[in-house]
């Protein structure tokens, strides 16, 4: 069964049973200052890292053994999220997928990178091939 959940991730994740999810696809704010009307994309560094640790810890809790997670992330924080997932939470890195854009994007008078990273990690239990 596929169930899509829409809401604040920290609230919604806490309501999900531990070890009950096979796959998570997450596209959190990239913390690049984009105006979504709620200030969620313009935090100072420490607050953004704490926020990331919080929701990734919940993802780690709800994933089944052998479950996988794909995290879309901007270039500024990919190494930090990798560190949280691999070193802090013990997830196993499978691959780094690059989502390449074919058009130039400009926002706030800045040229945005032509690609974004997707971290593909897994919990123990399956032989994942990247």
Residue positions per predicted region:
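Core catalytic lobe of class I
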Residues: 1-130
């Amino acid at each position: 069964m596929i169930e899509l959940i829409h809401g604040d991730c920290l609230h919604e994740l806490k309501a999900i049973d531990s070890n009950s999810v096979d796959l998570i696809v997450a596209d959190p704010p990239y913390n690049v200052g984009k105006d979504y009307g709620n200030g969620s994309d313009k935090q100072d560094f420490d607050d953004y890292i704490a926020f990331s640790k919080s929701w990734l810890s919940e993802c780690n809790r709800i994933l089944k053994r052998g479950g996988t997670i794909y995290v879309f992330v901007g270039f500024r924080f990919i190494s930090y999220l990798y560190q949280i997932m691999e070193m802090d939470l013990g997830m196993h890195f499978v691959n780094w997928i690059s989502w390449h854009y074919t058009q130039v994007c400009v926002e706030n008078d800045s040229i945005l990178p032509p690609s974004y990273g997707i971290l593909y990690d897994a919990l123990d239990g399956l032989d994942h091939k990247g």
